[in-house]
Amino acid sequence: MKFLFDLFPIILFFAAFKVWGIFTATAVAIVATLAQVAWVAFRHRKVDTMLWVSLGVIVVFGGATLVLHDEKFIQWKPTVLYWLFAIGLLAARYAFGNNLIEKMMGKQLTLPHPVWDKLNVAWALFFAVLGVANLYVVHNFTESQWVNFKLFGTTGAMVVFIILQSLWLTKYLKDE
């Protein structure tokens, strides 16, 4: 259910784009992300840093898209967000000694610390590659194809990555 909730702004962006175009879709994505943050704050009294970063990036890049009437800003937004996530994961681990992947998943999984470090680096690399892939699609495909990639391509890549990660982790999980 959380996965669908996380996709909420992207799905609304996609639907609005198909009906009204990129600028209305951008406004819808901003409002949907604001609503998402408000709901999480109301419901849980705490909003994850990643969601705050997502909100900041959509407001800045979406706002620039609307004010300057230039779709390139919203098209760059996923790349900036993915690269911020990658940098955040690596900086937290290697500059501050905090493995954010372990903090997020440590209650569900018991893994040796070197495995957590590999997982952290794998996620950082995954986000870095997603950022590059987004730029490639932005500069080599149509706006409509980019919107399809944004929903289906990145979501599909995420699902495949999680499945591969799960398969890799099975050799480290203890029988319970």
From Swiss-Prot:
It is a multi-pass membrane protein. InterPro entries: YciB (IPR006008). It is found in: Cell inner membrane. One of its GO terms (cellular component) is plasma membrane. The chain crosses the membrane at residues 3-23, 24-44, 49-69, 81-101, 121-141, 149-169. Keywords: Cell inner membrane, Cell membrane, Membrane, Transmembrane, Transmembrane helix. The keyword Membrane applies. The keyword Transmembrane helix applies. Its main location: membrane. It holds the Pfam family IspA. Belongs to the YciB family. HAMAP family: YciB. PANTHER family: INNER MEMBRANE-SPANNING PROTEIN YCIB (PTHR36917:SF1), INTRACELLULAR SEPTATION PROTEIN A-RELATED (PTHR36917). Plays a role in cell envelope biogenesis, maintenance of cell envelope integrity and membrane homeostasis. This is Inner membrane-spanning protein YciB. It comes from Burkholderia lata (strain ATCC 17760 / DSM 23089 / LMG 22485 / NCIMB 9086 / R18194 / 383). The gene is yciB.
